[in-house]
């Protein structure tokens, strides 16, 4: 399935006080050639920014029916291509990627992938959410539920919830990301998934190597030398 991203609505999340980021996103999206640009504003929660982030994603995924691309306002250009060929069964495609993933209640550089072609991989547990192409209503509805639960019930970012359900959907990612995050996360959002991830052919071996020694999942460094961490989230 060929997708001209310029003809897909671009929705970006931005708080009204972040005027500089608003200007940067308008400039970036116009530079990419997006024909429809929509700004949405999530809840301002200075006492709990992760919950605010999840709330913003909730507003974003409820704004319009798919297809649409949802952006966080710290996005920057990396290797953007306006026209892509994606699998016909895709529920979503991550245009911005991350080395980080969820694995057995740990967050760290454990992203599992399967190569579709040189440009696209299927992902099973990837964290991050700075640029995602949403394609099917079924998946959007799931993400709406996750965002609401994370924002209103447990008060945390939505991307662990996204990562934990990816294996139930057909979620793909650009191997070489189109967009990156600025600042500290730049290194882990500009790498190729195939350079840093765990291919599914190696998933069983990796699982067997840690299942009776979960301490091996603690302190694994990413490209920034930031360590993986045990980070369980409460249910309610």
How would you name each of these model-derived features?
Residues 1-71, 75-236:
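An acidic/histidine-cluster motif and surrounding catalytic segment
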